[in-house]
Amino acid sequence: MREVEARYIGKLGFTLVARHGRIGEETTAFEAGYGWDDLDRMGFKLRLSELERGAVNVVVQPGQWELPRVDHLGFALDEDDFVATLARAEVRELRVQEHGGRRTFVSTNAGFRLELHPPRDWLDDLLASSSELQLAELHLRADDPELKASTLGELLAAPYTEDTVMVGETIVRFVPDGPQGRPQLHAELFV
């Protein structure tokens, strides 16, 4: 996990927003300025690291896999699309978890979740930075590219083919020969 975080910060120029975790039973977060050696000495146990650059927000978490897997894809939606996407999830009887009005997760039953955000001021600020960096393509290695693409496309009402979904200006492509369940990060194209 530390190597993945280091790649985003060192090679791709992302900024560390915060590392969230625990010291003993106490939940805590550390912003940039605390190195891993400092955190290790404090007994810090990482839950997730949040990174940001331009209009891209990446959250990395420790996992049991050698290569990164994707738990969820996050989307900022306008109010109408947010409501319509939740309605489509309800029709499909998918599990929806709302977290205090800040974000909503939808389990897709296709090995990944969607994190949906209705309009928010902080999101507008993040998206306004798209001239600095935005995600043009995301390739995910998957066990069933067709299922994953159709699930994402249908839930978001986005155009899709057998392995590719066009979400706004971003292409999400599911490539074959991936692990069962959660897709594996295969490639990203930032512009």
Predicted regions span which residues?
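Conserved beta-strand in the GNAT
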Residues: 57-62, 115
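A cross-kingdom feature marking solvent-exposed beta-strand/loop segments within repeated
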Residues: 30-36, 42-45, 66-71, 75, ...
